Amino acid sequence: MSGAATTNTPDAVPEFRQVMGHPRPLWMLFMTEFWERFAFYGMRWALALYIVAQFHGGDSAGEAPASRLYGAYLALVYAAALFGGYVADKVIGYQRSILLGAVVMAAGLFMVMWPDESVLKLGLATVIAGNGLFKPNISTMVGKLYSVGDERRDSGFTLFYMGINLGAMVAPLLTGFLAERLLGGSADMPAYKV
């Protein structure tokens, strides 16, 4: 399972140590996707609110530009998967694409925390690029853990998607709680940056 993509011969499935009846790397991919979705949804719930509070003084006039930026961000996050899939297939391979995407996303998430609107926009663009490299390719890696016809493949994908759903479910609850308790949010200026 090299980092480079090959199209002319199917990759042989390497033997992995089994954990709970599945290849050990499945659990690493499960946790990786859990934390990626945690970061995505942990930021997503508060993004428009944060933009209005931080860059428009909480004024309702900031709702329209915040909503436009939020909408553009979400649309581009999902559209970037086309770019990321192509890059993985034709240029750097799935593993390298996932690693590069994770590093780029992390850099973007740190930029989003900077209290400057230009840096926020650059950070969102960076998250978009990283997500495009990461998101379409991690599912491909799950598929490569199992040989064609392996009966465990469906349950492996079910477990993987449980990681996605758990990250999405826990993120808004935990980040909201942390913003309130640790960062001193108040009714007039919630601590939207966790």
Feature locations, PLM:
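Short amphipathic helix-loop junctions that connect adjacent transmembrane helices
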Residues: 45-67, 180
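Cytosolic juxtamembrane N-terminal segment immediately preceding the first transmembrane helix
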Residues: 1-41
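C-terminal ends and interior cores of transmembrane alpha-helices
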Residues: 100-121
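Cytoplasmic membrane-interface "Motif A"-like loop-to-helix N-cap segments
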Residues: 90-102, 149-150
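Glycine-rich segments within core transmembrane alpha-helices of 12-TM secondary carriers
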Residues: 77, 154-183
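A membrane-interface helix-boundary motif in multi-pass transporters
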Residues: 62, 177-194
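Central cavity-lining transmembrane alpha-helices of secondary-active solute carriers
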Residues: 67-88, 135, 169-171
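Intracellular juxtamembrane helix-capping segments at the cytosolic ends
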Residues: 133-148
